[in-house]
Amino acid sequence: MDMPPTPLPPETANTSPAPNGATAGIRVENCYVFKSRLQEYAQKTGLQTPEYHTFKEGPSHEPVFKSTVVINNTSYDSLPGFFNRKAAEQSAAEVALMEIVKSIPANANIPAVQETGLCKNLLQEYAQKMNYAIPSYICTKSASGLAPFICTVEIGGIQYIGAAARTKKDAEIKAARTALLAIQGQSEGSANGATKYIVVPGKRVGKEVEKRPIETPKPLKVKKGGFKKKWNKRKFMKKDGQAVDVEKDEARVAGDAHDSDVLMQPTVITQEASCGTLFLQPCEEAKRVEAEPPRDIEMVQPDKENQHSDAALVQPDDEARVEQEPSRDISVVQPNEEAISGKQEPSIDAAILQPKEEASSVKQEPFIDTAMLQACKEAGSVELGPARDTVISQLNEQDRAVKQEPAGDIVVPQPDVHARVVKE
């Protein structure tokens, strides 16, 4: 007995297009039913079991197989060029079946193929491999005649009409035979060179060169390394005891030793001829007090009009108090954070200056006593000699500079907050 068929490798795949306008992508693959069908035919007809002779050809690393089947003393050769033994035997069995179907029963010992029912089986196997529906047979019977039955088979959406027969079974076999011959005839003239056979040798799949995907150049990314470079530069310069980054130092003050980003205004000290000592605080403007002989004291106010009076009291936060003691020439002004004191002669009017952004000047006569400033304390007292007036200047944000004539004393202004003045 013949061994059960096994699937064929991909080399035996049929490359012929599907018949009857089927999709070109559908192929009849692994058609290994022909040996079993030929074995069945031999058993029903009483013939000997088919004998297969397979030959190996070609080099050992790429062998090619060819097979020959012998049935009823007739040999049928397979198509050449198969890459395995089983595929060659299947091809030989197919060739034998096709030749038997085409033959006419000339000898009584060999009955007709259509009588064995092989055509219906082949057509059904073909439909299964092509993923078609099972072939359907429709038979009609005429009123009279020697062959009243005519059968039509439908496969793949196409109907095939068989020849007339005496019985319904014979009519179905003839219809299946007609369908097989039509399918084989349509596959003969295929453009890809395929033959009328289903099992055909395939092309050996060579080792294709591995195609590496084309690498598309990626756009270069902008490196954000500016800060890193500056940081490294600063670190290196700090280690060597040098200055920090030059670019950042442009926005800084050269004397800023703490690497602060806050801009500091340089301290400016000005001094004029014939003037006393001048002291200025940073971040504020200088205020000057000049003394002239017999002039009254002037008051400069950027936002208000000038005011002249014998005695004027300014109270920015609290009330001003004036006290006088008879036998003292020293005047002391003690604001919360700033105090300004000055000595004046009698018969000089007192004026109070309160500019916020501009410099104020106080003119005094010579022979002015010493003024003392004491910051960061509570309100002070002004002590003057008899018949002398007091001069008080209060600034919130600007420095005050005291300028005097040759006989003048030293005035040290320390501006910050409001001052309280006491006059008697």
Swiss-Prot record:
The keyword RNA-binding applies. Residues 287-308, 318-328 have a biased composition (Basic and acidic residues). This is Double-stranded RNA-binding protein 8. One of its GO terms (cellular component) is nucleus. One of its GO terms (molecular function) is ribonuclease III activity. It comes from Oryza sativa subsp. japonica (Rice). One of its GO terms (biological process) is RNA processing. Binds double-stranded RNA. Residues 1-10 have a biased composition (Pro residues). Residues 33-102, 118-185 form the DRBM domain. Keywords: Repeat, RNA-binding. The gene is DRB8. Pfam families: dsrm. Disulfide bonds: none annotated. Residues 1-22, 287-330 are annotated as: Disordered.
